[in-house]
């Protein structure tokens, strides 16, 4: 019988094919039409060819993949579909080798869609602690809870967005607006997760700096027209390496098992089919040995994404076609393998990378370590496959409580240490019950939301701010403590007269009560989230930087009537402080990012002195909103929006911009008051290793490998479904239909396409996170600190580096070290900060490598980028 296998080549959203002869050139060069382009780079580097700690994992993975059939390999690469299996993402299983459906679950703040879990302090709040120990402990606590709920792969941490746009919707998920801070926090988080046998998935790779236009089919507000393509984050070459790629390098060095590619385009090619980003930058230059998974629906092509370095498609269906049973991969990837449009070696590499990552991170699941919850229902029993109501009824929720003393203590510690004291006149804080016997608390953001907190992905914003909204939120935390609950408790405990006024619009009662109060606390907020939810006209990104729920007017009213007003700002990013920062009656201001479930406890503990403030700002707060990089809302008539603000600012992101332009901020990056001042002495910088200008050449790759059975099946009947398969509606299977046979594919490959593996990495590559020499200690900085106050406090010495003024590459000041230190009165402590070779390096766009320029460097030691206590010159 003659049967036809017709490869379905989906072209939806394919990148513009750019004919570039030298596909190793920088993607930041403009073509004649001034369009930013991302060159092609092939093939995908085969995993397992670095001489590193992944070798054992690859040996174990190869032993299994070498015995797998084509459909078994395909089943590992493709999600089974939305709302069918219990997690937000689920791969197919391979029962013959004891591999169950892999469970991938959001997110960076805790286990999404699961009961009894903890909503942890956001990444932004965590970054504000500047505490490396807490970075790790939070990761360990997250790992414990994910593991306890049966999750195999946690979709976090987030280091994209980098936070270059103050109004960016998802800034709260990541750790702040500096790549060094982000990378340090991400690496520790990854280690903590993976120590608990849960694979981390660092995201979003790369340039996902705003929610507006992040996907096709968005609305241009100026024309009301639908966009054709997602926004292109146009990123220059130096900025790509020095800023956006930097924390991903830290993540790879930490052994992260998976990387999630983002929805947006990067230099006019979609991130999940961008061969330069995935094949060259991530897998070759950074030496990433794990697998790349698409953001949910971010895969916009079949063959093209496969040869460009994508390894796993989630949730499996095509963009815009969830619960339709239609996939770019699954059955279509099987077809592409049989007609050789996608090389079998690429499929082998996908499957091997996935299994090797499971082994390397100790997250390889057993058949009895499965999800004990359903993402889709809170009921104890439900359909085995939720979206197919014809399937059997089984127990889907086991009500497992994953928390313990360690997880709860960690959540509170991180929340407390993240709170930043911005102003404290007349020693207003900590609150003295003897001096402030009548206490007023006001603001919607102090109390519970009238509709509770289990609203759609935490988009309820008429109460205390615990999280931002979207897939990065925790939908069903075990409990949440508002500032009202804990402040009222401490007020009663201290026998204070206490009142709480929730009303933030009709301010007559606030005016009356504030005039009688000895001290007034005003809790205000500003929220943001993911772009698929719009709250009060905020489509993920914030429309402006004002406070929500009339917060600015509330502060003004209270301060005009109470001479001792404390303002507590809780927000997902920067807000405008100019209306009240200098008000004489606003005697204290604290800022907190989304603090998670223990938010109220942490805030109250800081205000009443049960814990001392030790947080530092993870971003710059400007005096004027025009000093921030704006959200791009313009879309041309072509319907292909581009973000050139990233080009215009280049390396000058956040504090780099303010320092370079000599702009005085309201509050600088790294700023945070404590109850002590600190004296710095004996500052030294000493060489640990001779540093040459150029990196050493990396070791050659290990030999390329192939599986003996890679070409053993050319009979499509081998890929037919088993006769006894009981199909689930809209479930994605890898099997070919039984009425097909093989036909040669007719795919037009991009210019420069090749399947020939390289024998040697490029110069900046060759190791996890890049050339191993980049990670060697080059210099040590030592400084002695002595507290000048009477309390035991924690503070954060910060090291900023200035490059030689006569260097070839103009390089702005940048954070290159920090350490959180606790000192008692009179105690002296020496703090050692290490400078790695990469910390001294600049990206040479001509050589396409990192170099260390000769000349005089300056190490500046301070407690904020604009509050330097001492500096040391050293010459290379």
Curated annotation (Swiss-Prot):
<feature type="active site">
    <location>
        <position position="295"/>
    </location>
</feature>
<feature type="glycosylation site" description="N-linked (GlcNAc...) asparagine">
    <location>
        <position position="544"/>
    </location>
</feature>
<keyword id="KW-0732">Signal</keyword>
<feature type="glycosylation site" description="N-linked (GlcNAc...) asparagine">
    <location>
        <position position="224"/>
    </location>
</feature>
<feature type="glycosylation site" description="N-linked (GlcNAc...) asparagine">
    <location>
        <position position="585"/>
    </location>
</feature>
<dbReference type="InterPro" id="IPR017853">
    <property type="entry name" value="Glycoside_hydrolase_SF"/>
</dbReference>
<protein>
    <recommendedName>
        <fullName>Beta-glucosidase 1</fullName>
        <ecNumber>3.2.1.21</ecNumber>
    </recommendedName>
</protein>
<feature type="glycosylation site" description="N-linked (GlcNAc...) asparagine">
    <location>
        <position position="372"/>
    </location>
</feature>
<keyword id="KW-0325">Glycoprotein</keyword>
<dbReference type="InterPro" id="IPR002772">
    <property type="entry name" value="Glyco_hydro_3_C"/>
</dbReference>
<keyword id="KW-0136">Cellulose degradation</keyword>
<keyword id="KW-0119">Carbohydrate metabolism</keyword>
<keyword id="KW-0326">Glycosidase</keyword>
<dbReference type="InterPro" id="IPR036881">
    <property type="entry name" value="Glyco_hydro_3_C_sf"/>
</dbReference>
<feature type="glycosylation site" description="N-linked (GlcNAc...) asparagine">
    <location>
        <position position="75"/>
    </location>
</feature>
<dbReference type="InterPro" id="IPR001764">
    <property type="entry name" value="Glyco_hydro_3_N"/>
</dbReference>
<comment type="similarity">
    <text>Belongs to the glycosyl hydrolase 3 family.</text>
</comment>
<dbReference type="GO" id="GO:0030245">
    <property type="term" value="P:cellulose catabolic process"/>
</dbReference>
<dbReference type="InterPro" id="IPR019800">
    <property type="entry name" value="Glyco_hydro_3_AS"/>
</dbReference>
<feature type="signal peptide">
    <location>
        <begin position="1"/>
        <end position="17"/>
    </location>
</feature>
<dbReference type="Pfam" id="PF00933">
    <property type="entry name" value="Glyco_hydro_3"/>
</dbReference>
<keyword id="KW-0624">Polysaccharide degradation</keyword>
<dbReference type="Pfam" id="PF14310">
    <property type="entry name" value="Fn3-like"/>
</dbReference>
<dbReference type="InterPro" id="IPR050288">
    <property type="entry name" value="Cellulose_deg_GH3"/>
</dbReference>
<feature type="glycosylation site" description="N-linked (GlcNAc...) asparagine">
    <location>
        <position position="780"/>
    </location>
</feature>
<dbReference type="Pfam" id="PF01915">
    <property type="entry name" value="Glyco_hydro_3_C"/>
</dbReference>
<feature type="glycosylation site" description="N-linked (GlcNAc...) asparagine">
    <location>
        <position position="267"/>
    </location>
</feature>
<dbReference type="InterPro" id="IPR013783">
    <property type="entry name" value="Ig-like_fold"/>
</dbReference>
<feature type="glycosylation site" description="N-linked (GlcNAc...) asparagine">
    <location>
        <position position="739"/>
    </location>
</feature>
<feature type="glycosylation site" description="N-linked (GlcNAc...) asparagine">
    <location>
        <position position="426"/>
    </location>
</feature>
<dbReference type="InterPro" id="IPR026891">
    <property type="entry name" value="Fn3-like"/>
</dbReference>
<keyword id="KW-0378">Hydrolase</keyword>
<feature type="glycosylation site" description="N-linked (GlcNAc...) asparagine">
    <location>
        <position position="389"/>
    </location>
</feature>
<comment type="pathway">
    <text>Glycan metabolism; cellulose degradation.</text>
</comment>
<dbReference type="GO" id="GO:0008422">
    <property type="term" value="F:beta-glucosidase activity"/>
</dbReference>
<feature type="glycosylation site" description="N-linked (GlcNAc...) asparagine">
    <location>
        <position position="339"/>
    </location>
</feature>
<feature type="glycosylation site" description="N-linked (GlcNAc...) asparagine">
    <location>
        <position position="332"/>
    </location>
</feature>
<dbReference type="InterPro" id="IPR036962">
    <property type="entry name" value="Glyco_hydro_3_N_sf"/>
</dbReference>
<feature type="glycosylation site" description="N-linked (GlcNAc...) asparagine">
    <location>
        <position position="790"/>
    </location>
</feature>
<feature type="glycosylation site" description="N-linked (GlcNAc...) asparagine">
    <location>
        <position position="22"/>
    </location>
</feature>
């Amino acid at each position: 019988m003659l049967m036809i296998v017709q490869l379905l080549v989906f072209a939806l959203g394919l990148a513009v094919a750019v004919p570039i002869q030298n596909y190793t050139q920088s993607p930041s060069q403009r073509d004649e039409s001034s369009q930013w382009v991302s060159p092609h780079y092939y093939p995908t580097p085969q995993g397992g060819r670095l001489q590193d700690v992944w070798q054992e994992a690859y040996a174990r993975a190869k032993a299994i993949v070498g015995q797998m059939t084509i459909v078994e390999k395909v089943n590992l690469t493709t999600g089974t579909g939305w709302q069918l299996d219990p997690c937000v993402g689920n791969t197919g299983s391979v029962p013959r080798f004891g591999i169950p459906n892999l469970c991938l679950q959001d997110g960076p703040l805790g286990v999404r869609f699961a009961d009894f879990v903890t909503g942890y302090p956001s990444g932004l709040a965590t970054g504000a602690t500047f505490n490396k120990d807490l970075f790790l402990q939070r990761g360990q606590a997250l790992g414990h809870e994910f593991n306890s709920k049966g999750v195999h792969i946690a979709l976090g941490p987030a280091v994209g967005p980098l936070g270059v746009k103050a109004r960016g919707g998802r800034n709260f998920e990541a750790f702040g607006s500096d790549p060094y801070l982000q990378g340090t926090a991400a690496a520790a988080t990854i280690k903590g997760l993976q120590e608990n046998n849960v694979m981390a998935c660092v995201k979003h790779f790369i340039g996902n700096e705003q929610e507006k236009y992040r996907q096709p089919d968005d609305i241009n507000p100026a024309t009301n027209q639908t966009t054709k393509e997602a926004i292109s984050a146009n990123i220059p070459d130096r900025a790509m390496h020095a800023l956006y790629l930097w924390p991903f390098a830290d993540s790879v060095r930490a052994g992260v098992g998976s990387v999630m590619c983002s929805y947006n385009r990067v230099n006019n090619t979609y991130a999940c089919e961008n061969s330069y980003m995935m094949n060259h930058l991530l897998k070759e230059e950074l030496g990433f040995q794990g697998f790349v998974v698409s953001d949910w629906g971010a895969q916009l092509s079949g063959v093209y994404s496969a040869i460009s370095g994508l390894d796993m498609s989630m949730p499996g269906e095509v963009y815009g076609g969830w619960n339709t049973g239609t996939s770019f991969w699954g059955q279509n990837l099987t077809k592409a393998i049989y007609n050789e449009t996608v090389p079998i070696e690429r499929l082998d590499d996908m499957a091997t990378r996935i299994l090797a990552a499971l082994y390397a991170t100790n997250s390889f699941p057993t058949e009895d370590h499965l999800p004990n919850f359903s993402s889709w229902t809170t009921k104890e029993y439900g359909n085995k496959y939720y979206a197919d109501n014809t399937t059997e009824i089984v127990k889907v929720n086991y009500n497992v409580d994953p928390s313990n003393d360690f997880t709860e203590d960690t959540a509170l510690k991180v929340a407390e240490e993240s709170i930043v004291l911005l102003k404290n006149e007349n020693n207003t804080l900590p609150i003295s019950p003897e001096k402030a016997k009548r206490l007023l608390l006001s603001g919607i953001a102090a109390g519970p939301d009238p509709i509770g907190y289990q609203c759609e992905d935490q988009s309820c914003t008429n109460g205390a701010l615990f999280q931002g909204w979207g897939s990065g939120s925790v939908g069903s935390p075990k409990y949440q403590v508002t500032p009202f609950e804990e402040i009222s408790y401490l007020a009663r405990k201290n026998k204070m007269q206490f009142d709480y006024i929730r009303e933030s619009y009709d301010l007559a009662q606030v005016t009356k009560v504030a005039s009688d109060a000895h001290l007034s606390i005003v809790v205000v907020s500003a929220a943001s989230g993911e772009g698929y939810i719009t709250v009060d006209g905020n489509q993920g990104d914030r429309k402006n930087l004002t406070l929500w729920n009339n917060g600015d007017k509330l502060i003004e009213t209270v301060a005009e009537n109470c001479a001792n007003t404390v303002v507590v700002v809780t927000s997902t990013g920067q807000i405008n402080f100019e209306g009240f920062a200098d008000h004489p009656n606003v005697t204290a201001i604290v800022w907190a990012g989304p603090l998670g479930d223990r938010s109220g406890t942490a805030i109250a503990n800081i205000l009443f002195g049960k814990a001392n403030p030790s947080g530092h700002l993870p971003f710059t707060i400007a005096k004027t909103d025009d000093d921030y990089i704006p959200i791009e809302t313009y879309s041309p008539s072509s319907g292909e929006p581009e973000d050139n603000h990233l080009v215009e600012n280049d390396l000058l992101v956040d504090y780099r911009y303010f320092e370079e332009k000599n702009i005085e901020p309201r509050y600088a990056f790294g700023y945070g008051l404590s109850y002590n001042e600190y004296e710095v002495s004996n500052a030294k910088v000493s060489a640990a290793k001779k540093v040459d200008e150029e990196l050493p050449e990396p070791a050659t790759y290990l030999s390329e490998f192939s599986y003996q059975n890679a070409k053993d099946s050319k009979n499509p009947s081998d890929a037919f479904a088993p006769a006894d398969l009981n199909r689930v509606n809209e479930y994605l299977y890898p099997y070919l239909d039984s009425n097909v046979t093989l036909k040669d594919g007719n795919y037009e490959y991009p210019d420069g396409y090749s399947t020939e593996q390289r024998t040697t990495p490029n110069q900046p590559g060759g190791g996890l996170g890049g050339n191993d020499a980049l990670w060697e200690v080059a210099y040590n900085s030592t400084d002695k600190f002595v507290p000048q106050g009477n309390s035991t406090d924690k503070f954060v010495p910060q090291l900023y580096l200035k490059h030689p003024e006569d260097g070839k590459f103009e390089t702005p000041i940048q954070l290159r070290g920090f350490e959180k230190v606790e000192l008692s009165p009179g105690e002296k402590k020496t703090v050692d900060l290490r400078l790695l070779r990469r910390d001294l390096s600049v990206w040479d766009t001509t050589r396409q490598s990192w170099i260390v320029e000769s000349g005089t460097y300056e190490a500046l030691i301070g407690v904020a980028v604009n509050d330097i206590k001492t500096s040391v010159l050293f010459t290379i």
